[in-house]
Amino acid sequence: MPDAIANTATPVTVVALQQMKRDGRKIVGVVAWDWQMAQIVDRAGVDIVSVGDTVGINLWGHANPLEVTMDEMLIVTKAVRRGVKRALLSVDFPFGPLQEGPDAALRAAIRFVKEAGVDMVKLDGAADYPEAVAAIARAGIPVFAQFGITPHTALKHGIDYKSTLKLDVQLPPTLTAHLVGQAKRLEAAGACLLDFTHSGPVAGPAVVAAVAIPVIGGLGGGPWLDGRMRMGHAAIGYAASGIDHPLDTYAQVAQTTLAAITALVDDVRAGRQIKGGIPVKQH
């Protein structure tokens, strides 16, 4: 059983993930924001548990992903750390420290390691901040560097950004070469893993072949990469929008939750004992 394997296996390390690439074994990453989910995904045998700054939009109802602060990310990461025993724990930088320069980025990385016990830090838009990647890597902190196709890079190379999200997209050779170059520079700066956003089946394999470190993808990724990253809540269909408009996921937890809470309401209204409450003796 997967959980039996996960509970007896040795902790996942960066070295182990890099060996998985060399062996041709796919890497699995899941985004988690709380202690309960962390325990479950760790038991399932994922390789990476990533604490995403997407917690603001998906769990707290923020309208802007930039609202999440460093202190908030530390609180969330500490909770996830308590639930993860085997998988490698990564955390997203919130907006701010990376943009403030290498010194600020290094201070933030050190805080995540010292205060939250992370194994790796993830830098969004890392291709624009190679000095920060290098500074953190020199300090001995593993860096998970995100890069990829953005509306800006698509426009620069004369293509429609939305077209790059299709599985059969054919990217201009100049854009593929640009992305390969970014990946190589991030590897040279000291990144130990890459998160390639909107890789597609053309640039994705090219980047995978160009670097020795694992290339993982969430949005716009596919089996052409060394592994995949998925939000835990998305994988199980846990979003209010999924009640009326369910997506193709591995479960429909939002619908199950609605049915369960509706049943709870019915039991209370009808004067019945609720499930999981203190048993009531029948007279």
Where are these regions (language model features)?
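Alpha/beta enzyme core
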Residues: P2-H283
